[in-house]
Structure formats: structure tokens, C-alpha cells
């Protein structure tokens, strides 16, 4: 999540930024065995996701080159292209950043990169989530209002552009709230400890709570609700049509490519929603738990914490497998 520090932690660290506090070896975070395993798994998933998403983009590029030059990408393939780009962006920013930060424990890259990388991290998390919403909305409209979608060829491009724009805007506060803190002991004989955090950026604790809730809602709750509603509308519409005319069911079993394609994209959309839910739920459950109960860190084992957070990195690995299986 964007920031998950408790009010007590925020107040204590703010008072320590401009003063020296005693640092002991046991008071600072270190790279544990479970942390090393997390780093190893993170970079392994980074390689997998990079290979999978890049391969799909190359396959899509080869497909377009075989077509007539005047022919544009189909609506669905255009959506998949941007989802792949969003997943690749998340892979190239979030995974290496998480892996390297777990290795170094503290932040060595300075104030500017602290802000810029914090912005890019959240931007690259918003983009795939919003692209999933765009695909769900597009597929829902294609089934429930096919004539309106067919007559408005720019709708898909508009939703794609809006998804990228909102991702860049919603990640904007990261440039302000993140900054460096430096802790040093009284003697000045140690190099101290530096970290890229959000401490002292919120005037009141509830401002921080509101921002956390906003990012949580935009990254997970709202996209999940939209995907569930869109898939429910698709299933309801198809069920109603087939109930009114059972003979239309034969279209899905015929050699006609149009019904088969619609059924395939429906299955793909459901698979996307399932992957999104399975991969991100453990991550956000752990984040929300810590948000309301910071002491849970002392009750939940370190390996369990790392295991839950690694679930989120599976999503950009699964997505190219899903649309590679269903689309090409």
C-alpha cells in the first residue's frame, strides 16, 4: 500500500528526524533468511514476467505484420497490448525496486529518486488495475450493447487513454509525501540509517488514513467491484438470450468464428478477474491488517509476511499466460 504507518510511529519518527537518537544493532532492520528467499523469488518472478509479457508483445507485433498494412489491431488485441505494456511496466519497476530495497534494507539513492521511484511504483500498480477495468467494461458493453460499441470505434481508445491518465494523476501525491529521513546516534561515530518513507507528510493521522483508504479502494476494491459487476451483466445477458431462444446455443458450437470468439473473450475476462482476486487479496489483506493493527508484525512470522506479499507479483506473470492461451 502507499503508506501503512500508524499514528504513533509517524509521531515518533517525526520527532526523531531533526534530532539524534541512539541506534543499536538490534533496533535496525536487517536482511533475514526469509528476506533473502523473498529476494530470490522476486527476481525469479521478474525474469518470468519479463519473458512472458515481452514474448506476447513480440507475438502480437508479428501478427500485425502478417496482416494488411491498412488493417488496424482488433479492439480486443489493442486492449491486450496495453494491458501487457502495463504489466511490463509493473514488472520492470516494482519487482527490481522491491528486490533491491530488501537487499540494502535502507535507502541509498537520495531524495530525488526516493520521490520519483515512489511515484513510478504506484503509477505502475494503478495502470494494470485500470486496464483490467477497461477490458471488463469493453467486454460487458460488447455483449450487452453491441450496436452502440460498434458505432463508436473511438470508445476503446478513449478508455485506454483515460486509464493511463488517471494512473499518472492518482500516483501524483507520491512525489510530495515521500522523502528521506536520516537517523544517527549521539556520538556521530556511525553512518546512521537512511530511509525513503512518508513520515511527517500528513498534518493529521486521519489524512494518512484517508490516503491509504483511497489508494486501497482505487487499486483493489473499485476495480474488483467493476469486474464482478461487468462479468455478472455478461452472464445475465447471455443467460437471458439463450433462455428466450435456446437454438442460439448452437451458434457457440458451430463453425462460426464470431460466437466462438465472444465465448473465448468471456472466458478470458473471467480468468482475468479470478487472477486479479487470487493474486492481490493476500497482499491487501495483510496491508489492511497492519494498517489497523501495526503490532501484527510481531505476531505474524516473517516468512508468512514475505509469502503473502509475493502473491502480488504473480499477477503480471499469470496475465500473459491467460491472454496468450485465449487470444492467439
UniProtKB/Swiss-Prot annotation:
Gene Ontology MF: a single term: gonadotropin-releasing hormone receptor activity
Bridged cysteine pairs (disulfide): 114-196
Family annotation (Pfam families): 7tm_1
Family to which this protein belongs: Belongs to the G-protein coupled receptor 1 family.
UniProt keywords, alphabetically: Cell membrane, Disulfide bond, G-protein coupled receptor, Glycoprotein, Membrane, Receptor, Transducer, Transmembrane, Transmembrane helix
UniProt keyword annotation of Cell inner membrane present: no
One annotated Gene Ontology cellular component of this protein: plasma membrane
Annotated membrane topology: Multi-pass membrane protein
InterPro entries in the cross-refs: GPCR_Rhodpsn, GPCR_Rhodpsn_7TM, GphnRH_fam_rcpt
UniProt-recorded name of the protein: Gonadotropin-releasing hormone receptor
Subcellular compartments: Cell membrane
All ranges on the Cytoplasmic side of the membrane: 59-77, 138-164, 233-281, 327-328
Topology Extracellular: residue spans: 1-38, 98-115, 185-212, 301-306
Single GO biological process annotation from the record: G protein-coupled receptor signaling pathway
Primary localization class, coarse: membrane
Role: Receptor for gonadotropin releasing hormone (GnRH) that mediates the action of GnRH to stimulate the secretion of the gonadotropic hormones luteinizing hormone (LH) and follicle-stimulating hormone (FSH). This receptor mediates its action by association with G-proteins that activate a phosphatidylinositol-calcium second messenger system.
Record keyword Transmembrane present: yes
Annotated glycan sites: 18, 102
Top-rank lineage group of the source organism: Eukaryota
Residues spanning the membrane: 39-58, 78-97, 116-137, 165-184, 213-232, 282-300, 307-326
